[in-house]
Amino acid sequence: MAHEQATYTTRPGAFTARGHELTALGDELRVGDLAPDAELAGRGFVPAPVRISDYRGKVLILSCVPSLDTPTCDRETRRWEEERRALGGDIEMLTVSMDLGFAQARWCGAADVTHTTASAYMNQQFGIDYGVLMEENRLLGRAVFVIDRDGRIRHLEYVREQSTEPDYAAALAAAREAAAG
C-alpha cells in the first residue's frame, strides 16, 4: 500500500530562536481569511476536545506558543490572562501549545490561569493550517490571531524571534474593534 506524501508550503527562516533560523510548515494566513477549524486537546489526562469553531459568535484571541514551560511563553500566557480578565465577555482567549494536556493543567493551576488552553500535540495539522508548526522541533511558533464572530481573521502576528513577546496592544485593539462592530 503506497502512502501519500503530505504537501504543504515550507517557509525557511519564518521563525528564529536566539538567531537560529527555523522553518515553518504551512502557508501564512492573512487578514480576511476564514480561520481554519481544528480539534485540539483540552487540559487533563483525558482531555476534552476544544474546537476553533466552538468560538463562532464570539471574538477570539488565539495565542500560539511553543511551550508553557518556557520563560517567554510563561510571561505571555500570564499577560493574556491579565488582559482577558479586563476584557468584556464578548472576547474569548485560547492559548494553544504542544504541551500535553495534563502538563497544561499543572502549569495553569500553578500560574492561576483560568482561560482555555489546548494542545495541538495530537493534531499537528493545526500548526500547518495556521502556518506555525516548526519543522525542526515540531513545536508551534509564537503567533497571535484575532478571529471575529464570523470566523474571519481580523488581526494576526507571526512573531519571528521566539524569545520575543507579541504586540499585545495591536491584538487587543483589533479584538475590541471586532467586538464593537
What are these regions (language model features)?
Residues 1-181:
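Chalcogenol-based redox active-site neighborhoods
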